[in-house]
Amino acid sequence: MKALTARQQQVYDLVRDHISQTGMPPTRAEIAARLGFRSPNAAEEHLKALARKGVIEIVAGASRGIRLLLEESGLPLIGRVAAGEPLLAQEHIESHYQVDPALFKPSADFLLRVSGMSMKDVGIMDGDLLAVHKTQNVRNGQIIVARIEDEVTVKRFKQTGNKVELLAENPEFKPIEVDLREQGLTIEGLAVGVIRNGNWS
């Protein structure tokens, strides 16, 4: 790694601290305001310099698209998942949250942004971050993250022989029925906790 100038180190430290405190990178405007730059464009130039030196990666098209390459600690947050790609593929990781995985039992391996209200009756709401322990060993009655033909879903697991039911916790949603002889089902992990609006629950 090339040495950073004093100003570049300030920008890097700000990005790292902002991620540590809020779970997400700052915007260019926030960097400019904190460090007294005249415009977000000045912040962008410093970020590009840091990217050239290999300490960050700039993710195109995202206002908070900054990824630390030196010390990307914490739990990866999985956003939109592309068809045919592993759930934890780099391009699915929106950011990292500075959360101790050991706070969950069993320990969490990643966070998944919940979409929809199918699990609202157990307190899992649209937009929540679901802490997930990566495993394929699950038991009936547990809440799991599953992938069916590239659709990722959070449901309660029930298996009888070759038949699996993925049960919603909302009477407005019907169970998803899977015949393992005819359809692919991948267990991505076990739900071990929920973060709502940055708070534990």
Swiss-Prot record:
Represses a number of genes involved in the response to DNA damage (SOS response), including recA and lexA. In the presence of single-stranded DNA, RecA interacts with LexA causing an autocatalytic cleavage which disrupts the DNA-binding part of LexA, leading to derepression of the SOS regulon and eventually DNA repair. It comes from the Bacteria. One of its GO terms (biological process) is DNA repair. Keywords: Autocatalytic cleavage, DNA damage, DNA repair, DNA replication, DNA-binding, Hydrolase, Repressor, SOS response, Transcription, Transcription regulation. Homodimer. It holds the Pfam family LexA_DNA_bind. This is LexA repressor. HAMAP family: LexA. It catalyses: Hydrolysis of Ala-|-Gly bond in repressor LexA. PANTHER family: LEXA REPRESSOR, LEXA REPRESSOR-RELATED. The record marks A83, G84 as: Cleavage. The keyword Zinc does not apply. Residues 28-48 bind DNA. One of its GO terms (molecular function) is DNA binding. InterPro entries: LexA (IPR006200), LexA-like (IPR039418), LexA/Signal_pep-like_sf (IPR036286), LexA_DNA-bd_dom (IPR006199), LexA_repressor (IPR050077), Peptidase_S24_LexA (IPR006197), Peptidase_S24_S26A/B/C (IPR015927), WH-like_DNA-bd_sf (IPR036388). It comes from Photorhabdus laumondii subsp. laumondii (strain DSM 15139 / CIP 105565 / TT01) (Photorhabdus luminescens subsp. laumondii). Belongs to the peptidase S24 family. Its EC number is 3.4.21.88. The active site is at S118 (for autocatalytic cleavage activity), K155 (for autocatalytic cleavage activity). CDD domains: S24_LexA-like.
